[in-house]
């Protein structure tokens, strides 16, 4: 996987800590243990909560080959793992992501439609099998 791309500004401290620790791609981040995340959080300004969020995003990026913004949308909508996505329905994914986008007040059309949700769920279920 490529180096971190499209990370929101809210993760800038975590990005700096990860890069200083030599972790510059999604695969390495996905594979970090809780202890390693805690060590990173203690070493600088990165928050444990944001590091865990980034690890969840990394899991979706690596496992499902999703773009980071789509993985972040799923994670923030409460679908943080490929197993959770595999257990969901397309309607539920559209509902949860749409609710999040409306609460953020982006004013743009929904990113996730039934076709997209179905595609993501199929990938997640293939991973599970």
Question: What is the predicted role of each segment?
Answer:
Residues 1-129:
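C-terminal extensions
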């Amino acid at each position: 996987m490529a180096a971190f791309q499209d990370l929101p500004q809210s993760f800038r401290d975590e990005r700096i800590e990860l890069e200083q620790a030599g972790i510059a791609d999604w695969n390495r981040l996905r594979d970090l243990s809780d202890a390693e995340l805690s060590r990173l959080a203690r070493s600088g300004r990165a928050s444990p909560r944001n590091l865990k969020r980034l690890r969840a995003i990394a899991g979706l990026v690596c496992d499902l080959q999703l773009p980071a913004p789509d993985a972040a949308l799923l994670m923030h909508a409460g679908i943080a793992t490929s197993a959770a996505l595999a257990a969901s329905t397309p309607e539920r994914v559209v509902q949860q992501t749409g609710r999040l986008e409306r609460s953020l007040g982006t004013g743009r059309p929904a990113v996730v439609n039934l076709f997209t949700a179905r595609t993501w769920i199929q990938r997640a279920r293939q991973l599970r099998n």
